[in-house]
From Swiss-Prot:
Source species of the chain: Flavobacterium psychrophilum (strain ATCC 49511 / DSM 21280 / CIP 103535 / JIP02/86)
Identification of the protein by name: Probable nicotinate-nucleotide adenylyltransferase
GO molecular function: ATP binding; nicotinate-nucleotide adenylyltransferase activity
Transmembrane parts of this sequence: none
Listed Gene3D superfamilies: HUPs (3.40.50.620)
Catalytic activity line of the entry: nicotinate beta-D-ribonucleotide + ATP + H(+) = deamido-NAD(+) + diphosphate
Record family assignment: Belongs to the NadD family.
Keywords: ATP-binding, NAD, Nucleotide-binding, Nucleotidyltransferase, Pyridine nucleotide biosynthesis, Transferase
Gene: nadD
Protein's pathway: Cofactor biosynthesis; NAD(+) biosynthesis; deamido-NAD(+) from nicotinate D-ribonucleotide: step 1/1
NCBIfam families xref list: cyt_tran_rel, nicotinate (nicotinamide) nucleotide adenylyltransferase
Function summary: Catalyzes the reversible adenylation of nicotinate mononucleotide (NaMN) to nicotinic acid adenine dinucleotide (NaAD).
GO biological process: NAD biosynthetic process
Pfam families cross-referenced by the UniProt entry: CTP_transf_like
Length: 193
């Protein structure tokens, strides 16, 4: 089974995340997309970052009607700080019959050379890349790489920061969130302070 890993803080998950994840699941050779919720770094203070399990719950709510999208808390169980290369190795050990790939935006691809052991990632895993606004061009060392697949996908520029700020300022952002996610956020009074 081919699994695409889509990492994020998902603070909160929004329709932009779902559009990209679902597009990758439906328009590539991936069988599933796992939405990997990245844990809070205890060394960094982040007033607006919800608890790891609250964010995971939001991802569960958002993906429950999408059979090819699965929430994942795999990084919660790994020593911190963690690196993507470690997560990939752990998953390959845990699920040896699965083929794991990364999903990332063009902006992240252009900084891939700064990632820990990025060469090992490229040697052992496919990378599916979606377009982003304000990304000039893809770095030449990656543009024709056999393990990198540029996927034509909708360009969705919605940010979780924008959503949090608008909730705090009592603006209506319901169209940007899956209905169950909005209901849970509103009921729990998240991001209002």
């Amino acid at each position: 089974m081919k699994i695409g890993l889509y990492f994020g803080t998902f603070n909160p998950i929004h329709i932009g995340h779902l559009i990209i994840a679902n597009h990758m699941a439906e328009n590539s050779d991936l069988d599933q997309v796992w939405m990997v919720v990245t844990p809070h770094n205890p060394l960094k203070k982040k007033d607006t970052l919800l608890d790891d399990y609250q964010r995971l719950h939001l991802v569960n709510l958002a993906t429950e009607d999408y059979p090819k999208l699965k929430p994942s808390d795999i990084e919660f169980k790994l020593p911190q700080p963690n690196y993507t290369v470690n997560t990939l190795a752990h998953l390959q050990d845990k699920f040896p019959s699965y083929e794991f790939s990364l999903i990332m935006g063009e902006d992240n691809l252009n900084s891939l050379h700064k990632w820990k052991n990025y060469e090992a990632i490229l040697q052992n895993h496919q990378i599916y890349v979606y377009p982003r606004l304000n990304t000039d061009t893809i770095d030449n060392q990656f543009i024709n790489h056999q393990k990198i697949h540029i996927i034509k996908a909708p360009i969705v520029e919605i940010s979780s920061t924008f959503i949090r700020e608008n909730i705090k300022n009592k603006k209506n952002i319901q169209p940007l969130l899956p209905p169950k996610v909005w209901k849970y956020i509103d009921h729990s009074n998240f991001y209002k302070k």
